[in-house]
Amino acid sequence: MLENVRGLLDAVFDDYRNKIERQLTKLGYVPGWQLLNASDFGVSQLRPRVVFVGIRKDLAAGFSWPEPIRNDPPTVGELLHDLMAANGWPGSERWREQANAIAPTLVGGSKKHGGPDLGPTRAKRAWAALGVDGTGLWDDAPPRHFVGLPRLTPRMTARIQGFPDSWQFSGRKTAAYRQIGNAFPPPVAAAVGRQIFAALAVKRIFKVA
């Protein structure tokens, strides 16, 4: 299984995809590409991603792409309110009401600007509409006396990406955010992984029977 940005399905990459498909077919695999939206799998983020799965030919009939879940993901305000309020910031309730949509796509951290930010100008405008200052990250939640637009912390971005709060990231703020922003959202990876496991399990059950 491989994951990449949605642009991989553009016509300019047809030859690249076709080459991969031909090579894997020769090796006895059935290749397939699918555009999956993270928000269809409970992730509070606008994050379309292309997923590639290559299944061995004798197992391919047992594989199908995961179906979207029925429930809408929580808004950014619903998802992050407890983290925003962790230091007693009185503006957290009003902020939760403003952050009433899912997040724009998280990026992997900007080396050009010397540190983590939440994306280009258009993305920063989308974050501002949600009550978030997208020009950088904080190490901690806003303090009690804070006035203005708060920034996210790495832990907040990890939750937006679908990581459990117990997940640990290596390094300081910038390094941690780059790991988070470049990651494949775990709920989507898990959904695809379960389908791959199901295809493998069919063969195993058949052998046992």
Predicted regions and their residues:
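C-terminal target-recognition/interaction regions appended to catalytic cores
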Residues: 84-209
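Class I S-adenosyl-L-methionine
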Residues: 1-129, 206
